[in-house]
A protein has these predicted regions:
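Transmembrane alpha-helical segments of polytopic membrane transport and secretion proteins
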Residues: 1-27, 53-75, 151-154, 158-160, ...
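Beta-strand-rich domains and repeat architectures in extracellular enzymes and scaffolds
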Residues: 24-32, 38, 45, 60-88, ...
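Conserved beta-strand element within WD40/beta-propeller blades
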Residues: 33, 81-85, 123-126, 181-185, ...
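Short loop/turn segments immediately following beta-strands, especially the blade-tip
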Residues: 49, 135-148, 194-202, 243-250, ...
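A short beta-strand motif characteristic of beta-propeller blades
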Residues: 58-64, 99-105, 154-163, 205-213, ...
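Repeated scaffold domains used in trafficking and secretory/extracellular systems
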Residues: 66-74, 108-120, 157-174, 213-226, ...
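Short coil/turn segments that connect the beta-strands within blades of beta-propeller domains
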Residues: 77-79, 119-121, 178-180, 226-228, ...
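Structural motif
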Residues: 87-92, 129-136, 187-196, 236-243, ...
């Protein structure tokens, strides 16, 4: 009788141990499944927008004074809109509210202005006397009495003395580390100026200079990655790539064309760290070409192609990213 009671107690003990074990294992397994489900749900929430089509929304209109505009730009975080006028006035506006933040007079007439690659706050400005200046825009955030305040300013960080560049048909500028390279073209002739040990807040020193010629009249010119190449492009789509690793001995690496028979070049821009070129042609095609160098030499290969309803007139690239925007002749905008 004693043995029977002991066996019954042991059986009940095992029964409860088994039930508790099953419950704990079930809860643990359910928690693991729930955790995996949450992880996949989070990944889906993060990744899904990548596959969603982009859209464009109209923002606030800015109430600005009527002046001939040389350039409209926006800060990297999209908070401040800058307008550079041909009369040398720089205006900054809050993008969200359209409110004017600041205005400055550069004291010169602007012939043309564009960004210095790859920066988003330094501009190469050519005045009416064909002097090249470098203008910087700054947007500094301060907190006063727990209130966020944005202060915008414009200055000449490399000195106010301009660089005489003469009559030109194209220009590009590239600041790589502390090395500033300026390339200008006048018809077939290219002129390179290289400044070493460039530091903001100090004037430019003496430049190394070299000139050489392309095989055609140049309409567009771009400096390649790390100041190693120069792309020279003609109005009809001819292209030559020069190696400028040794500034005193530029070498022609490639010569060819960016258009097919029957096409004309309507727009182009460098992309992907300037290892590729995006080209728009008169039939509405937009082609991205990659530049490759190997033992066989240098070549251009088509990477991808898009078709627009009308020819592209201008491309706008996204800084440090692969995307770009195309504006066609009908005034429509396409994100790619």
């Amino acid at each position: 009788m004693h043995d029977v009671d002991s066996s019954e107690r042991l059986s009940r003990r095992r029964y409860w141990i088994n039930r508790i074990t099953e419950t704990v294992v079930g809860i643990g397994g359910g928690a693991v499944i729930a955790a995996i489900t949450l992880i996949f749900a989070y990944l889906l929430w993060v990744v899904a927008p990548i596959f969603k089509s982009a859209d464009i929304e109209r923002s606030n209109q800015l109430r600005a004074a009527e002046r001939p505009t040389a350039l409209v730009d926006i800060s990297e975080n999209g908070e401040v809109v800058s307008r550079f006028s041909n009369d040398g006035i720089v205006e900054f506006y809050n993008q969200a509210s359209g409110r004017a933040l600041a205005g400055f007079d550069l004291g010169l007439q602007v012939r043309s202005i564009e960004r210095v690659y790859p920066l988003v706050d330094l501009y190469a400005l050519i005045d009416e006397e064909r002097l090249l200046h470098f203008v910087r825009s700054q947007h500094i955030v301060n907190f006063e009495n727990d209130q966020r305040r944005l202060a915008s300013s414009a200055d000449f960080p490399l000195g106010s003395d301009g660089i005489a560049i003469g009559e030109i048909t194209a220009i590009d500028t590239h600041l790589f580390d502390s090395e500033l390279l300026i390339v200008t073209a006048n018809e077939r002739e290219l002129a390179l100026r290289k400044y070493q040990d460039v530091e903001m807040g100090f004037g430019l020193g003496a430049a190394q200079q070299v000139t050489f010629k392309a095989g055609f009249s140049i309409s567009n010119i771009y400096i390649g990655p790390r100041n190693q190449w120069v792309y020279a492009v003609g109005e009809t789509g001819e292209i030559e790539i020069f190696g400028i690793g040794s500034l005193q001995r530029p070498t022609r690496m490639y010569r060819g064309t960016l258009v097919e028979p029957g096409q004309t070049l309507t727009a182009m821009t460098p992309l992907l760290g300037r290892y590729s070129l995006v080209v728009g042609t008169s039939d509405g095609a937009v082609t991205q070409y990659g530049i490759y160098t190997d033992a066989a030499g240098t070549r251009l290969d088509a990477i991808r192609q898009f078709a627009l309803p009308s020819p592209a007139q201008r491309f706008v690239t996204e800084p440090r990213r692969k995307g770009f925007m195309a504006l066609d002749q009908d005034g429509d905008v396409h994100l790619m």
